[in-house]
Amino acid sequence: MKALILVGGYGTRLRPLTLTQPKPLVEFANKPMMLHQMEALAEVGVDTVVLAVSYRAEQLEQEMTVHADRLGVKLIFSLEEEPLGTAGPLALARKHLEGDAPFFVLNSDVICDFPFKQMVEFHKNHGKEGTIAVTKVEEPSKYGVVVFDQDKGKIDDFVEKPQEYVGNKINAGLYIFSSKILDRIPLKPTSIEKEIFPEMAFSGNLYAFVLPGFWMDVGQPKDFLKGMSLFLNHCHTTKSDKLETGSNIHPTATIRGNVMVDPSATVGENCVIGPDVVIGPRVKIEGGVRILHSTILSDSSIGNYSWVSGSIVGRKCHIGSWVRIENICVIGDDVVVKDELYLNGASVLPHKSIAVNVPSKDIIM
């Protein structure tokens, strides 16, 4: 089988992390976001992955080719000269997707359990052109709702932000298509959700697969952290060995709840880590540090007695001693935060040195 991943554009919602690398390469649970998808695809026999890219293709190719080789997956880059929406990239990559076998299409922001084997079986059983994975949400009025037959899965309609209850399932950004869909898509900017799917549903060719378990679009910081929490909880409930805590944790340190610590990271004495924390490769956490609901990306350090809550610390950062960082701070790569400072909801661009408090939400340029 083949797959196409919609890599998209500039990753503006996840800035400043995406100012120094493409969004699919941002570390999520200690590996590039896209790698979670590629590993799951490889497990169900996908041997060719097309990346629909329009931004920093060279950086993506340099890193993801190494992972693709390890997984035995052929990587093809389909470069958009102009934005083509969510359907146009399929037309551009048509020659790579044509054939008798169905193919996957994924939005690169999505994290879930990726039940691709069940999706393939569902798609083959109904035998039509397309399958959309759908997921349950608590407030369907905020989304576009997919209306479908609950028994067979055939999609009847799409209702954008309904004011009256019509259902609670939304498009999860994971699809399987037969190559017939390619005849529906012109090589121009086209929305698959607004232009192609309604047409397919009207002709009875589109079915909904209900995702079991967790799902999150992690394209912005708040959802990135929520998705991380859901991912760690999934690792816990499935007793996954991904919840490694490594051997470089001081015996006086306390681990609370679901925590992932890369084996190459170190955690100092009397630290309290967790719940819902990911500590990346070669990170150094000094003594007495408290971290909760946060991720510390690779090669960063946190000084003595600092506090990090509900925040993302980018790569190669140095956070001083007695620093307090909270309320969805997003610290870009290679940032220095001096000792005894308070950052509240700050978004700090890469390569900055912070020497004053940021007491309210602000962008530090």
From Swiss-Prot:
GDP-alpha-D-mannose binds at D109, D217. Mg(2+) binds at D109, D217. It is an enzyme of class 2 (transferase). Enzyme activity is reduced by incorporation into the GMPPA-GMPPB mannose-1-phosphate guanylyltransferase complex. Allosterically inhibited, when part of the GMPPA-GMPPB complex, by GDP-alpha-D-mannose binding to GMPPA. GO terms for molecular function: GTP binding; mannose-1-phosphate guanylyltransferase (GTP) activity; metal ion binding. InterPro entries: GMPPB_C, GMPPB_N, Hexapep_transf_CS, Mannose-1P_guanyltransferase, NTP_transferase_dom, Nucleotide-diphossugar_trans. One of its GO terms (biological process) is IRE1-mediated unfolded protein response. Keywords: GTP-binding, Magnesium, Metal-binding, Nucleotide-binding, Nucleotidyltransferase, Transferase. Pathway: Nucleotide-sugar biosynthesis; GDP-alpha-D-mannose biosynthesis; GDP-alpha-D-mannose from alpha-D-mannose 1-phosphate (GTP route): step 1/1. Residues 244-365 are annotated as: Hexapeptide repeat domain. Its cofactor is Mg(2+). It comes from the Eukaryota. It catalyses: alpha-D-mannose 1-phosphate + GTP + H(+) = GDP-alpha-D-mannose + diphosphate. SUPFAM superfamilies: Nucleotide-diphospho-sugar transferases (SSF53448). Coordinates binding with substrate and required for enzymatic activity. GO terms for cellular component: cytoplasm. Its EC number is 2.7.7.13. The active site is at K161. Residues 2-221 are annotated as: Substrate-binding domain. The N-terminal substrate-binding domain adopts a Rossman-like fold and has a binding pocket for GTP or GDP-alpha-D-mannose. Substrate binding is coordinated by an Mg(2+) ion. Component of the GMPPA-GMPPB mannose-1-phosphate guanylyltransferase complex composed of 4 GMPPA subunits and 8 tag-335/GMPPB subunits; the complex is organized into three layers, a central layer made up of 2 GMPPA dimers sandwiched between two layers each made up of 2 tag-335/GMPPB dimers. Catalytic activity of tag-335/GMPPB is reduced when part of the complex and binding of GDP-alpha-D-Mannose by GMPPA induces allosteric feedback inhibition of tag-335/GMPPB. Catalytic subunit of the GMPPA-GMPPB mannose-1-phosphate guanylyltransferase complex. Catalyzes the formation of GDP-mannose, an essential precursor of glycan moieties of glycoproteins and glycolipids. Can catalyze the reverse reaction in vitro. Together with GMPPA regulates GDP-alpha-D-mannose levels. Belongs to the transferase hexapeptide repeat family. This is Mannose-1-phosphate guanylyltransferase catalytic subunit beta. It comes from Caenorhabditis elegans. The lineage of its organism: Eukaryota, Metazoa, Ecdysozoa, Nematoda, Chromadorea. The gene is tag-335.
